[in-house]
């Protein structure tokens, strides 16, 4: 009886901890490498990148580790316009500048380059954003090469 109770309590603690971490940092997005200008021999699919659906939940935004060498891409593959919001943080002068409800038309693409982390990267080293609808796919490209 005690073993089951301890296991249950442990499981509940794990779920609470997982939720706390997940809701704090959101849905992580993996940076993808862009090759060039002299990449050497390129193999099949090496220049491809992957789109994923962005998070629509403000409580669990999509996040990525920002180094100052990223290009954030959006593709609205829906049939109507949808928006995205990129959350800023206070810079050294206490200024913020969220990109709020930026509209991306049906079938359109949008991009934002993060070459300066001030005002965007939070204390955990992450940038966060949400999309209005799961029809908006996102990709983060590492442009440091």
Residue spans of the language-model regions?
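Intrinsically disordered, low-complexity Pro/Gly/Ser/Thr-rich segments with frequent PxxP/GP/PP motifs
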Residues: 93-124
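Short, surface-exposed beta-strand/strand-loop-strand elements in extracellular ectodomains
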Residues: 79-95
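Asparagine-centered strand-capping/turn motif at beta-strand->loop junctions
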Residues: 66, 73-78
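Surface-exposed ligand/attachment interfaces on beta-rich extracellular proteins
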Residues: 41-67, 83-85
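Predominantly extracellular/luminal regions of secreted and cell-surface proteins
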Residues: 24-40
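Short beta-strand/loop motifs in extracellular/secreted proteins, especially
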Residues: 70, 80-85, 136-139
